[in-house]
């Protein structure tokens, strides 16, 4: 027993003077980037306005804790092109813009940058990686967001957030990141992103969207109609063209309905029950066209009468 104790003490002394391997701090995949509705709308609008060129801007927000990055607002940078280089970032414009935003009640700091990839997915090119490394030199947790305004449709925004991987950790065969939480959702990487160095030179960060009551009211009021829209008078020539289109559609549907009535005479009860399955019902479409034409003409007539009466 004393022999084992001596061996244990010797091992402890060797451990004290030797270099024990220690666990390094790996990147945590539970870190999430929360983008506000205002910032997302601004990025999409800026990216759509710059098509087919790439555009760039800076993101304002705060680092809440080790696992949360809030992006509250964004502003555009005055350049566009096929690539965004480090030299293209104008520090004078950035400083002036931040000063003006502070005067309007935006004291947030720069948490990263965004740029658009119109039509070719979300990934970082070599120039983008150099730009992101320049941002990470100022802040280790800076985030690069890539948005595709061409592939983005209503209900599905093509967007992703990235951060570069330290090449020293890759040289030591360390993991680029370590999954420590089941929170968040990583998008399935595309083949283009894997070809351009995803999980080798940079890694993806989950993105979430958090809206409060004021943002929900703002989004609901975007396409909200007012009472003026109901009484507005359209161009009479345009209204006449629409009536012609309605009449042509009704004539075509009437012919189809007449043909359908002739075909029903030779059908059995089972065939009549399934005759409109997977097909257009001309009778119902005629009723829809008539209802739409009547509503448009009634509203146009009433709006014209109100305008004439009020101006007399």
From Swiss-Prot:
Top-level class of the enzyme under EC nomenclature: hydrolase
SMART domains on file: JAB_MPN
Motif (JAMM motif): 115-128
Keyword list, A-Z: Hydrolase, Metal-binding, Metalloprotease, Protease, Proteasome, Ubl conjugation pathway, Zinc
UniProt cross-references to Gene3D superfamilies, sorted A to Z: Cytidine Deaminase, domain 2
Gene Ontology BP terms: programmed cell death involved in cell development; proteasome-mediated ubiquitin-dependent protein catabolic process
Keyword hit for Zinc: yes
Binding site for Zn(2+): 115, 117, 128
Enzyme Commission number: 3.4.19.-
Residue ranges occupied by any MPN domain in the UniProt entry: 33-168
Coiled coil: none
Its biological purpose: Metalloprotease component of the 26S proteasome that specifically cleaves 'Lys-63'-linked polyubiquitin chains. The 26S proteasome is involved in the ATP-dependent degradation of ubiquitinated proteins. The function of the 'Lys-63'-specific deubiquitination of the proteasome is unclear.
Protein name: 26S proteasome non-ATPase regulatory subunit 14
Source organism: Caenorhabditis elegans
Annotated gene: rpn-11
């Amino acid at each position: 027993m004393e022999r084992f104790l001596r061996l244990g003490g010797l091992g402890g002394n060797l451990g004290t003077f030797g270099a024990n391997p220690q666990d390094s701090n790996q990147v945590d995949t539970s870190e999430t980037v929360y983008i506000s509705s205002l910032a997302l709308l601004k990025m999409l609008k800026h990216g759509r306005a710059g098509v087919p060129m790439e555009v760039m801007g800076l993101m304002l927000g705060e680092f809440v804790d080790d696992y949360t990055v809030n992006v509250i607002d964004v502003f555009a940078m005055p350049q566009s092109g096929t690539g965004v280089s480090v030299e293209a970032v104008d520090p004078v414009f950035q400083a002036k813009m931040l000063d003006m935003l502070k005067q309007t009640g935006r004291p947030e700091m720069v948490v990263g940058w965004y740029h658009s990839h119109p039509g070719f997915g979300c990934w970082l090119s070599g120039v983008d990686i150099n730009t992101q490394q320049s941002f990470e030199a100022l802040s280790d947790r800076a985030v690069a967001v890539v948005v595709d305004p061409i592939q983005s449709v209503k209900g599905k925004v093509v967007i992703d957030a990235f951060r570069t991987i330290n090449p020293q950790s890759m040289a030591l065969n360390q993991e680029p990141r370590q999954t420590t939480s089941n929170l968040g959702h990583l998008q399935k990487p595309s083949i283009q992103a894997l070809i351009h160095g995803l999980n080798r030179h940079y890694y993806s960060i989950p993105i979430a969207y958090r809206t409060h009551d004021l943002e929900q009211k703002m989004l609901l009021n975007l396409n909200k109609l007012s009472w003026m829209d109901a009484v507005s008078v359209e161009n009479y020539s345009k209204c006449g063209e629409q009536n012609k289109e309605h009449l042509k559609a009704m004539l075509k549907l009437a012919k189809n309905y007449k043909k359908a009535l002739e075909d029903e005479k030779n059908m059995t009860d089972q065939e009549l029950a399934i005759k409109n399955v997977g097909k257009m019902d001309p009778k119902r479409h005629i009723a829809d066209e008539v209802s739409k034409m009547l509503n448009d003409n009634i509203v146009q007539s009433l709006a014209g009468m109100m305008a004439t009466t009020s101006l007399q």
